[in-house]
Design a protein with these regions (language model features):
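Basic/aromatic-rich interaction segments and small domains that mediate binding to polyanionic partners
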Residues: 2-48
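Mixed-charge, Lys/Arg-enriched low-complexity segments
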Residues: 51
Length: 51
């Protein structure tokens, strides 16, 4: 995953906003919550790559 990628988990969409050696942060589009993507290692899928 890279910054700007659109990801999906159980029908919810999020944007990757930070990629570092110790964390990958995603912002959920429905409520703006920011979380570590490691919480969703199973089932988190890149929908659209920003390249």
């Amino acid at each position: 995953m890279q910054v700007g990628d659109l990801v999906e988990h159980n029908g919810y969409l999020a944007l990757v906003i930070c990629v570092a050696s110790y964390e990958t942060l995603i912002r959920w589009l429905d409520d703006g919550t920011v979380e570590d993507a490691d919480n969703y290692t199973i089932g988190l899928e890149v929908v659209s790559e920003s390249r």
